[in-house]
């Protein structure tokens, strides 16, 4: 046990090891978010391409951890890769991927939450500078014939496309890039705070209706509690919808509240990010 603790402390102090561990954690976040698109609740294959990608991501994450002297965590990912190959039910694979991403973040002291409230105005400016060319100024990517890329960029303006994404996943993509796509890493070009600003702004693009947002703000003023930016950072729109389903609000009002909380932070405990 002492040996593993020493290895963990040395790895956490090694910038190269932290970078590799960050990529591993990001890969597992993709698996947690997309495995249910590849495999159905009874183990049926929904998308062979997605399933192959999920297995590849887990194995790449294991390789990153072995290069970071985290053989114990890599061994657990070998087991997870076997469960992906066996088409295990989504709750099992998603839960294990999330747990492993958390363990990696804890061991290597990764920044998985914003240190202060993100700045949406700065996020908008950064989005226009760094993201609009591929993802579109309003979150709708240009037609494929105008932008020939190996994969279609995420449509941030699409509610269905964005339903499973959290700011944390967008932050990971901006930090480490996305394997097999044209999405580069902005880890060196943007500060940690700027990447969080960008991630939070991207989640607003599927909620652009001014009337819907105004209705949501009205409802939030009557709410006894509202989520802060730390809670919003790790939750996808679908997770927020599930929480709102217990509120007694109509479906339209739930969407309005979701729009409002993505656009502002009514209960923010911090100051603007640096």
What are these regions (language model features)?
Residues 58-59, 79-88, 148-207, 229-264:
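Extracytoplasmic electron-transfer domains, predominantly the class I c-type cytochrome c fold
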Residues 35, 138, 174, 178:
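Short, small-residue-rich loop/turn micro-motifs
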Residues 41-48, 128-151, 179-185, 189, ...:
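Periplasmic/extracellular electron-transfer cofactor-ligation site
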Residues 43-51, 139-169, 221-224:
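Gly/Gly-Pro-rich "capping" loops immediately C-terminal to redox-active cysteine motifs
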Residues 121, 134, 175:
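Short glycine/serine/threonine-biased micro-segments
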């Amino acid at each position: 046990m002492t040996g593993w603790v020493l290895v963990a402390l040395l790895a956490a102090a090694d910038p190269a090891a932290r970078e590799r561990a960050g990529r591993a954690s990001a890969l597992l976040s993709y698996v947690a978010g997309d495995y249910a698109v590849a495999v159905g609740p009874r183990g049926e294959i929904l998308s062979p391409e997605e399933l192959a990608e999920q297995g590849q991501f887990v194995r790449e994450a294991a390789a990153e951890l072995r290069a970071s002297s985290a053989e114990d965590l890599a061994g657990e990912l070998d087991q997870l890769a076997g469960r992906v190959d066996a088409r295990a039910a989504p709750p099992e694979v998603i839960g294990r991927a999330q747990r492993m991403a958390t363990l990696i973040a804890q061991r290597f002291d990764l920044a998985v939450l914003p240190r202060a409230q993100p700045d949406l105005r700065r996020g908008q400016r950064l989005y226009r500078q760094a993201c609009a060319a591929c993802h579109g100024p309003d979150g709708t990517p240009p037609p494929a014939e105008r932008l020939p890329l190996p994969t279609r960029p995420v449509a941030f303006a699409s509610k269905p496309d964005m339903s499973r994404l959290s700011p944390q996943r967008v932050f990971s993509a901006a930090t480490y890039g996305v394997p097999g796509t044209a999405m580069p890493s902005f880890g060196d070009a943007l500060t940690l705070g700027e990447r969080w600003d960008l991630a939070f702004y991207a989640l607003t693009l599927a909620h652009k209706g001014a009337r819907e947002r105004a209705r949501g703000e009205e409802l939030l003023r009557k709410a006894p509690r509202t989520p802060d930016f730390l809670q919003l950072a790790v939750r996808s729109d679908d997770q927020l919808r599930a929480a709102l389903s217990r509120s007694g609000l109509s479906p339209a009002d739930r969407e309005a509240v979701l729009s409002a909380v993505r656009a502002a932070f009514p209960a923010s405990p911090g100051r603007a990010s640096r």
